[in-house]
Design a protein with these regions (language model features):
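Short hydrophobic/aromatic beta-strand immediately N-terminal to the Walker A/P-loop
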Residues: 34-36
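Phosphate-binding P-loop
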Residues: 26-32
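N-terminal pre-Walker A segment at the start of P-loop NTPase domains
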Residues: 2-24
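Short phosphate-coordinating micro-motif centered on Lys-Gly-acidic
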Residues: 3-11, 57, 93, 101-147
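P-loop (Walker A) phosphate-binding loop of NTP-binding proteins
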Residues: 38-40
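Short beta-strand-centered segment that lines the nucleotide-binding/catalytic pocket of NTP-utilizing
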Residues: 58-73
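Conserved lysine of the Walker
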Residues: 45
Length: 147
């Protein structure tokens, strides 16, 4: 099992502080990073990814690609960015049909919701962004890196 190194923790994150947190997350990612975004249903995975995409100077966020599974963006500052929502993936045959393994070979940034559904094809080294809802409904975000 790979060890995870905690890179940063943000507490009491709200909609008003999320853009600054997103900027800080970008500063910690390596080029062409793969980021598994984890959290309970409703924790704010899609909202957090939207903030990250907006910080990459992409004006129009398409929303969660729940039915399409993959949404591609072209950023003037970060090149290609993929947002994946793997919630609907049910088996390995779907992974093969979607061509996700080949997609992960691209030189791009990847933000993946429900990555546990594709754990067998996750890149060896990647980032984990955990989102938890606090009792006051703010969020705590923790960024880890496999090493």
């Amino acid at each position: 099992m790979k060890a995870k190194k905690l890179l940063a923790t943000w507490t009491a994150v709200s909609p008003t502080t999320l853009p600054e947190v997103a900027q800080q997350i970008w500063s910690l990612l390596t080029p062409q990073a793969f980021v598994a975004v984890e959290g309970e249903m409703g924790a704010g995975k899609t909202t957090t990814i939207a903030a990250l995409i907006q910080k990459a100077q992409i004006e129009h966020f398409e929303g969660s690609p729940t039915f399409a599974i993959v949404q591609a963006y072209h950023s003037p500052v970060k090149d290609k960015i993929y947002h994946l929502d793997c919630y609907r993936i049910e088996n390995e045959a779907e992974l093969i049909n979607l061509g996700l393994e080949e997609l992960f070979d691209e030189s791009a940034y990847f933000f993946v919701e429900w990555s546990e559904k594709i754990k067998q094809i996750l890149p060896f080294q990647h980032f984990w962004l955990y989102i938890r809802t606090n009792p006051d409904l703010s969020r705590t975000l923790e960024l880890y890196h496999d090493h």
